[in-house]
Amino acid sequence: MRYFIGIASKNHIQIGQAGGFCQLCHGKAAPLKRMKQNDKIIYYSPKLTMESKEPYQAFTALGEIADENVYQVEMFKGFFPFRRNVLWSEIKRECPLNVAKTHPEWKAYASKLRFGHFEVSKEFFNFLAEYMTQDS
C-alpha cells in the first residue's frame, strides 16, 4: 500500500466526493496510473476555488483508491479528464497547513505541493489522517 497527496481546489474535490472519484493534474492519466487499488490519498486545497486568489491551505479530503480502473469521461464539451474511483472517508475536521508543518517530515514535502500529486510516507499520511478523523 502506498500513500499520496493530491492537490486541487476544495470545490473541485467536493465534485469528486459527490461522484465517488478523483482527478489529478487537470485530468491527466499518468498520476492516476501511479496509484493502485487500496492506496490512500489525502487532498490538499490551496484555495477554495480555482478562480479564487484567497488562500485556503488545508488538507480537505481523505480516501482510498477503490479499484484498478483509470477511465475518461466528458466533463463538459471538449474536456475529457481521466478519473479513478475513490472510497471517500468521513472526516471530522480539515487539517490546516500549519498543523502539517509541525511534522518532522514536512520540509521534505513542502516544495512538492506545486506538483499536483506526490507520494508520502505512511507516517506523514497517518499524521494528517488522524488529525482529520479525530474530534477537535
From Swiss-Prot:
Q: Which Pfam families match?
A: EVE
Please give the family membership noted in the entry. Answer: Belongs to the UPF0310 family.
Q: What is the recorded name of this protein?
A: UPF0310 protein HH_1062
